[in-house]
From Swiss-Prot:
Role description: Catalyzes the transfer of a ribosyl phosphate group from 5-phosphoribose 1-diphosphate to orotate, leading to the formation of orotidine monophosphate (OMP).
Any one GO molecular-function label of the UniProt entry: magnesium ion binding
Gene that encodes the chain: pyrE
Keyword Glycosyltransferase: yes
Substrates-to-products reaction catalysed: orotidine 5'-phosphate + diphosphate = orotate + 5-phospho-alpha-D-ribose 1-diphosphate
Protein name: Orotate phosphoribosyltransferase
Listed EC numbers: 2.4.2.10
Subunit and interaction comment: Homodimer.
Binding site for 5-phospho-alpha-D-ribose 1-diphosphate: 117-125
Binding site for orotate: 121, 149
Length: 194
């Protein structure tokens, strides 16, 4: 799937938004990918994750033994990637501000984990998720995401396999360009809700 095809899926779902957005990283952007709108359509989610699963298989073969995603944004693509790859799909969620496995989910030292995210911007949530997995003794071999907003600049600590890259400028709140300063900011993400 090409970058244009991926972005067309987001546009068709009404998920490629323009305005002034506060990202989960705290940075500001004039573009927001509202993946919840994409994930509300099972067929669209399946198409995107099927393409990502093919890309992961081309790079990793059968190496992953389990998929782990960070809640909340990674749960739907993590589930669909697990379905596409025939693997178990788990997720970590925040407890007292830190990601942890709950709900009876367990990993062992023999598990080779593929982390699945929706969108990667700075890689912070990814690194926090990977840190939680590392504490279990399992090995994170790579991360996969639908869109890498950093254009390949985010360091998640393991190889990052993105269905596409879509570099979108993001700014600290005190360094906004005039066009963003003129628009009220909204915070559409999920960080800080739990």
């Amino acid at each position: 799937m090409t970058r244009d095809e991926v972005l067309a899926e987001f546009r068709a779902a009404g998920a490629l938004l323009e305005g002034h957005f506060i990202l989960s990283s705290g940075l500001r952007s004039g573009v927001f990918l509202q993946k919840a709108r994409v994930f509300s359509e099972p067929e669209r989610t399946e198409r995107l994750c099927k393409a990502l699963a093919a890309k992961v298989r081309a790079e990793l073969g059968d190496a992953p033994t389990v998929i782990v995603s960070p809640a909340t944004g990674g749960i739907v693509p993590g589930y669909e990637m697990a379905r596409q790859m025939g693997l178990k799909g788990l997720y970590v969620e925040r407890e007292n501000g830190e990601f942890t496995l709950r709900r009876g989910f367990e990993l062992t030292k023999d598990d080779k984990v593929l982390v699945v995210e929706d969108i990667v911007s700075t890689g912070l949530s990814s690194r926090e998720c990977i840190e939680a997995i590392n504490k279990t003794g399992a090995t994170v071999i790579a991360e996969a995401c639908l869109v890498d907003r950093s254009g390949g600049e985010a360091d998640v600590g393991v190889p990052l396999i993105a269905l596409t890259e879509y570099k979108v400028p993001a700014y600290p709140a005190d360094q906004l360009p005039p066009e963003l300063e003129a628009i009220p900011a909204i915070k559409p993400g999920s960080r800080g809700l739990a």
